[in-house]
Amino acid sequence: LYVEGENQNGVPFCSYTDEIYHRTGYATEVYTLGNVSCDNYNVGYSDARGNTWYFYYNGIKKTNQLLERIDDVPATSNDDIEKKEQITGQAYFLRAFFYHQLYSLYGRIPLVYHTFDMNAEWTETRADMDEVADSIVADCNRAAQLLPTEYSSNDFGRATKGAALAVKART
């Protein structure tokens, strides 16, 4: 599952981890110091790069599309089944991560678990804080069940069971 390696403002996702070394006075210090809030989140190259809601809900849409269609993909061997499980786990992890980012910034957010028909009316409302947290935890639990604890060096950067449990712990 492909997702951009930076947020909508051009700040790399690695800035959110403890594996980054802060060298400049640029936007990364907001992340490395743990000072991200809805008041200072739009830091980066330019506010014109996009908005937070669009960026994360676009990622949520992609994960929902995958989760709705993954069962249509045939799996005839044990390797195929294992690969499908890993891809499904990655989708649950990414959806949890995207919701966690929105939850951290805005609290009550709409929870969307399906794709929309182009002619459908938008009727989603913001969920309660506990409902959002429970949703993130549920996706993290699903991801942790499906993801491996590590990958080969060729798959560096993919979501692991530990990453899913870390997002769960932060929620």
Task: Identify the meaning behind each predicted range.
Residues L1-H22, D39, E82, I87, ...:
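Acidic, glycine-rich segments characteristic of secretory precursors and extracytoplasmic regions
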Residues G5-N7, L102-L111:
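Proline-centered turn/helix-capping motifs that create local helix->coil transitions or kinks
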Residues Y26-Y106, E121-T123, A127-V132, C140-F156:
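Conserved, well-structured interaction surfaces
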Residues Y92, L165-T171:
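TPR/Sel1-like alpha-solenoid repeat signature
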Residues T115-M118:
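Short edge-strand/loop segments of extracellular domains
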Residues G157-V167:
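Amphipathic alpha-helical protein-interaction segments enriched in hydrophobic
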